[in-house]
């Protein structure tokens, strides 16, 4: 996260909503930079960022409770535009002289707004007398609005669904404009950012790239950087950005643990060495990893073994290089946002990649994290800006522990080889059908189950392969992809005919929730 003021930015105060990150995504989609800060440190964040507008998130808390989160007075005193969402509306009303009460009718899900008065925020979007779908999720409700406010829209259970004090540029809604279930929500946020706050949408990846290169050079100086290259989008984009900044001062290490997709390690090495002229060390550690994983069936034990072996292997290679002062990582913004706790202070949740967790402390290195202000979709845009091919940028997500967690039960070399072939055929059929970009993630799973089959004149007793494909926006929720049966039949036939060791194929039709996307 930036440590300095950022011109033309928006500050988002997080009161603990599960969808606060969606607010940030909507703001950035308008070409405007924003940051999320927990309510406990909102004054410091406000002073540091020096934003031109403030958005208040929802919350699981009740504005009626003693000690519930509040907006610092300095923000109201600043004269900046404020947009309160759900709990954000309730705390505005509670703090500025309105009234909030526990709702007798909790309102969750789809609702319809009736537009009663016009305002600048509605320009080019809504008109008086029109009706629009929104998404509600609240128990408490506003029952009296503060002096200076007027009601702009109502719903059947929320008589103050949309209120505003246009003189002070305060807008507050009971619904959630940031979610896709409010069709006009993104445009509302855009109107607030551009029309009300007057911020120009000129934040771009090319500008971010130039700034990041400058910051990396200032941080690293003439020192050396090593970067763990996994072959994924995040670590690859981070490595290219660092390389653009410091050139030969960067060395990348690709630890090949034998758990990647078919030909993946070779393809990554070829791309980075030949096309980008990166100093890349390819470590063949397949025997080391697979040897220790053989027979291990517990998913968490698999992860711990992979993480430990990666650190050991990486340390050994780094020592051969004579060490380095900095470690490059592809940490993203969702990994560093502070989560909000109502039982105490904020707890910082760093979702350390299984490969690099603990490396900086163990090796006495400082971190270079050039992507820590970006969301995943923004990293893909930056990757394109840096010249990575669309076929690489648009690849489906792949888990850190790789194929080890797509082999439920014990891992063996034979099972990994069988799975790798089945997965490659499945993805090939998806691409041939023109479905790859319509699916968020697709993969094969080799089940620890063998079944009887008949192939030719002989009886077989071989593994079952499960195929998985989901649609999703961010991986938090997902629905199984609805293939036609002809496609599934074609993919299954190829896998059974071409992969020795599989005689039955099934398709997973579980959504998330209740299931998860991966099987382990």
UniProtKB/Swiss-Prot annotation:
Limits of the Glutamine amidotransferase type-1 domain: 9-202
Amino-acid positions noted as binding ATP in the UniProt annotation, renumbered to this chain: 230-236
EC number: 6.3.5.2
Active site positions: 86 (nucleophile), 176, 178
GO molecular function: ATP binding; GMP synthase activity
Disulfide-bond pairs as recorded: none
Key words of the record: ATP-binding, Glutamine amidotransferase, GMP biosynthesis, Ligase, Nucleotide-binding, Purine biosynthesis
Enzyme class at the top of the EC tree: ligase
Key word Lipid metabolism present: no
Involved pathway(s): Purine metabolism; GMP biosynthesis; GMP from XMP (L-Gln route): step 1/1
Pfam families: GATase, GMP_synt_C, NAD_synthase
CDD domains xref list: GATase1_GMP_Synthase, GMP_synthase_C
UniProt-listed HAMAP family: GMP_synthase (MF_00344)
Catalytically driven reaction(s): XMP + L-glutamine + ATP + H2O = GMP + L-glutamate + AMP + diphosphate + 2 H(+)
Residue intervals of the GMPS ATP-PPase domain: 203-395
Protein name listed in UniProt: GMP synthase [glutamine-hydrolyzing]
CC per GO annotation: cytosol
Upper classification of the organism: Bacteria, Pseudomonadati, Pseudomonadota, Alphaproteobacteria, Hyphomicrobiales
Subunit structure: Homodimer.
Coiled coil: none
Range of residues in the leader sequence: none
Function: Catalyzes the synthesis of GMP from XMP.
Gene3D superfamilies associated with the record: 3.30.300.10, 3.40.50.880, HUPs
């Amino acid at each position: 996260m930036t440590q300095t003021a950022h011109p033309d930015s928006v500050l988002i105060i997080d009161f603990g909503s599960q969808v606060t990150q969606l607010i940030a995504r909507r703001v950035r989609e308008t070409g405007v930079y924003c940051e999320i800060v927990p309510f406990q440190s909102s004054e410091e964040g406000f002073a540091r960022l020096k934003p031109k507008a403030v958005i208040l998130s929802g919350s699981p808390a009740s504005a009626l409770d003693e000690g519930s989160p509040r907006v610092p007075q300095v923000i109201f005193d600043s004269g900046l535009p404020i947009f309160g969402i759900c709990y954000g509306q309730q705390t505005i009303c509670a703090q500025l002289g309105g009234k909030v009460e526990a709702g007798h009718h909790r309102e969750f899900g789809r609702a319809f707004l009736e537009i009663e008065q016009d305002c600048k925020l509605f320009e080019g979007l809504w008109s008086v007398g029109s009706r629009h779908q929104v998404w509600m999720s609240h128990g408490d409700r506003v029952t009296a609005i503060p002096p200076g406010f007027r009601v702009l829209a109502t719903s059947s259970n929320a008589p103050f669904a949309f209120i505003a004090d246009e003189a002070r540029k305060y807008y507050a809604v009971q619904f959630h404009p940031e979610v896709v279930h409010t069709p006009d929500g993104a445009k509302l946020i855009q109107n607030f950012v551009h029309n009300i706050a007057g911020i120009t949408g000129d934040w771009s990846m090319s500008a971010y790239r130039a700034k990041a290169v400058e910051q990396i050079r200032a941080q690293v100086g003439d020192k050396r950087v090593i970067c763990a290259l996994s072959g994924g989008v995040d670590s690859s984009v981070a490595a290219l950005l660092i390389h653009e900044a410091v050139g030969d001062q960067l060395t990348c290490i690709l630890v090949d643990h034998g758990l990647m997709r078919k030909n993946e390690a070779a393809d990554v090495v070829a791309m980075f060495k030949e096309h980008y002229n990166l100093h890349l060390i390819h470590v063949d550690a397949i025997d080391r990893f697979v040897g220790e994983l053989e027979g291990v069936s517990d998913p968490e034990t698999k992860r711990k073994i992979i993480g430990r072996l990666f650190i050991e292997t990486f340390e050994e290679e780094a020592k051969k290089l004579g060490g380095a002062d900095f470690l490059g990582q592809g940490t993203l913004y969702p990994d560093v946002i502070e989560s909000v706790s109502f039982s105490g202070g904020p707890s910082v949740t760093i979702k350390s990649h299984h490969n690099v967790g603990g490396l900086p402390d163990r090796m006495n290195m400082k971190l270079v994290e050039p992507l820590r202000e970006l969301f995943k979709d923004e990293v893909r845009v930056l990757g394109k800006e840096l010249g990575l091919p669309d076929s690489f940028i648009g690849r489906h997500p792949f888990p850190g522990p790789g194929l080890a967690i797509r082999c439920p039960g014990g891992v063996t070399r034979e099972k990994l080889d069988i799975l790798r072939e089945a997965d490659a055929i499945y993805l090939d059929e998806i691409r041939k059908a023109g479905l790859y970009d319509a699916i968020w993630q697709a993969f094969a799973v080799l089940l620890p189950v063998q079944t009887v089959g008949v192939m030719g004149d002989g009886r077989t007793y071989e593994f079952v392969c499960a195929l998985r494909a989901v649609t999703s926006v961010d991986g938090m929720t997902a629905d199984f992809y609805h293939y036609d049966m002809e496609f599934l039949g074609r993919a299954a036939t190829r896998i059974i005919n071409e992969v020795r060791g599989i005689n039955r194929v099934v398709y997973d039709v579980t959504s998330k929730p209740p299931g998860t996307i991966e099987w382990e």
